[in-house]
Regions:
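Solvent-exposed edge beta-strands and adjacent loop segments
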Residues: 1-69, 113-127
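Short, hydrophobic/proline-enriched secondary-structure or compact coil segments at domain edges
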Residues: 3-6, 70-73, 91-100
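Short, acidic/charged, Gly/Pro-enriched secondary-structure junctions
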Residues: 83-108
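Oligomerization/assembly interface segments of phage tail-like spikes and tubes
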Residues: 58-80, 129-143
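A general structural signal for short secondary-structure junctions and capping/turn motifs
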Residues: 61-62, 85-87, 96-97, 125-129
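Mixed-charge, glycine-accented linear interaction segment located at domain edges/termini
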Residues: 112-175
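Short, conserved charged micro-motifs
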Residues: 79-86, 146-148
Length: 175
């Protein structure tokens, strides 16, 4: 299974729904996620049998808060996988996860990014055991469904300088 992600600082916008209805309050409209110019989503292939995406409600009466969690494993204790563990350790990320029903779930947003809460690598104690790198990312927000596809998440247009006063307007004027 392939997960897509980007640093929260790579996004130009992620517009969360403002609807009141149950379903509509959790669907991000197509076109409401945009990367900054020159940025793109990265992908990582995860071990299919051991991944999960969940949402929990924690707290006490009148103090409930939502928390979402993504757990997955990468096969092999390799320099690439260990590098992914160390590079994402303190970075705020936004993940895009396709489920078996064809929905694209969004974990994290501009206000509440997903952070690594648990990560460990093991070579396995016995020869037959898998060597894996385990990850758990959490965000203090609910999960949102993206109404578009992952391929439709584009980047903002390059900002061009327009007009005669875009550069050097303080030079060359005589009064």
């Amino acid at each position: 299974m392939r997960l897509y992600y980007a640093s929260v600082s790579d996004f130009a916008k992620i517009v969360l729904p403002e609807a009141e209805g149950y379903e509509d309050s959790r669907i991000i409209s197509k076109g409401n996620i945009l990367l900054k110019h020159g940025k793109s989503l990265k992908a990582v292939d995860v071990y299919l049998d051991q991944g999960s995406l969940s949402e929990k409600v924690t707290g006490s009466a009148k103090r409930w808060k939502q928390m979402s969690e993504l757990s997955f494993q990468l096969t092999g204790m390799t320099p690439r996988n260990l590098g992914f563990l160390s590079q994402t350790g303190n970075s705020g990320l936004v993940f895009f996860v396709s489920d078996s029903n064809g929905r694209v779930w969004v974990l994290g947003n501009l206000r509440n990014a997903a952070y690594l809460t648990s990560g460990d690598a093991t070579s396995g104690k016995k020869f037959e055991e898998d060597n894996m790198v385990n990850f758990t990312f959490s965000a203090n927000t609910g999960l949102y469904e993206y109404a578009g596809s992952i391929a439709e998440i584009g980047e903002e247009a390059e900002k061009k300088q327009v007009g005669g006063f875009s550069r050097g307007f303080s030079k060359g004027f005589r009064i």
